[in-house]
């Protein structure tokens, strides 16, 4: 047992311009090699492009995209009796959002396009509409969980 006290729970900070935690989560996931100012630049340019494309509130588009991509259930490999089963497990809201952001960024990196801001804005708009690679990934995950429903008792 640890002799230390209990660790303080860290609260997620919000970004300086929009004061939004989702934007901050997105910035922290897009971050590479410690270049946070570049990550902020990419996200803010993407938000401006979303504003130009949809002519609606870009933060609501971002929220809707993340909400649509967030999975309810996923599969986890579990070794039982010498064989590995894909066991469906429910996902919490924070972990679901983190997965959704990861999938959105992965899908936008694979997209053809000029720069990351353009690709990210396109993927977010598509996800908000209900199409795109990230949505496909979510549906694929849900299909896997449904197919392996028989192993749900292995939790």
Curated annotation (Swiss-Prot):
GO terms for cellular component: chloroplast; small ribosomal subunit. It comes from the Eukaryota. One of its GO terms (molecular function) is structural constituent of ribosome. Gene3D superfamilies: Ribosomal protein S7 domain. GO terms for biological process: translation. Keywords: Chloroplast, Plastid, Ribonucleoprotein, Ribosomal protein, RNA-binding, rRNA-binding. InterPro entries: Ribosomal_uS7, Ribosomal_uS7_bac/org-type, Ribosomal_uS7_CS, Ribosomal_uS7_dom, Ribosomal_uS7_dom_sf. One of the primary rRNA binding proteins, it binds directly to 16S rRNA where it nucleates assembly of the head domain of the 30S subunit. HAMAP family: Ribosomal_uS7_B. This is Small ribosomal subunit protein uS7cz/uS7cy. It comes from Calycanthus floridus var. glaucus (Eastern sweetshrub).
């Amino acid at each position: 047992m640890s002799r230390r006290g209990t660790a303080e729970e860290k609260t997620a900070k919000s970004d300086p311009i929009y004061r939004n935690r989702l934007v901050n989560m997105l910035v922290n996931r897009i971050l590479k090699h410690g270049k946070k100012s570049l990550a902020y630049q990419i996200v803010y340019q993407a938000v401006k492009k979303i504003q130009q494309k949809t002519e609606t509130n870009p933060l609501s588009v971002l929220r809707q995209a993340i909400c649509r991509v967030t999975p309810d259930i996923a599969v986890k490999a579990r070794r039982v009796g010498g064989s590995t089963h894909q066991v469906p497990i429910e996902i919490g809201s924070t972990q679901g959002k983190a997965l959704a952001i990861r999938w959105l960024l992965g899908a936008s990196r694979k997209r053809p396009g000029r720069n990351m801001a353009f690709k990210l804005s396109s993927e977010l708009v598509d996800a908000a509409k209900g199409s795109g690679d990230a949505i496909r990934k979510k549906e694929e995950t849900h299909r896997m969980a449904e197919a392996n429903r028989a192993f749900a008792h292995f939790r």
